[in-house]
């Protein structure tokens, strides 16, 4: 099942709804939904997750991106993009809190991550405006980072298994592509079955992950054991 956040101007979103008492059904995104994300793979959100944290009073929020390029020499977080994880704790499908994540220019191994939040957005909804406040966490990519507020952050490559022979899949069921242009491709099937033995085509690839763990109390609007939050992620220019 697919759950979507609103489509933002030059922004891409994916999300879930979770009970903080016990994480409910997790719903994940598609990949390369639009020409914009296929032409700009660092804008492509793979999945958004909410997991129980390292203790009963904590929650982990995860957004993965860019899986087609991780493992190549162009793999890095885009310094020109704003990565956001948004939280609705009022049940109206509008964000009440945001995490805003940005990166500096450079190769992945030299990048630094800056995380602001959880904080009320400057303008909720379809606008994407940087919140003017100090970073909650800041430090090198690929490092476990902490803070005195209980927020922990990791940003960097992580294995994200997806067991499929994707090349043969599209030989069987060709993707919907235009007949001309940069994204053109075949429109007729050239195979009727998967290869035997199977090919784990995506095995060499990782995803770029942004992981934030923090006390649940920092996201909730009440102390009710039935309190729920909605979680989604966006990437925008």
Regions found by a protein language model. Give the residues of each.
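Terminal low-complexity, poorly structured segments
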Residues: 3-4, 23, 141
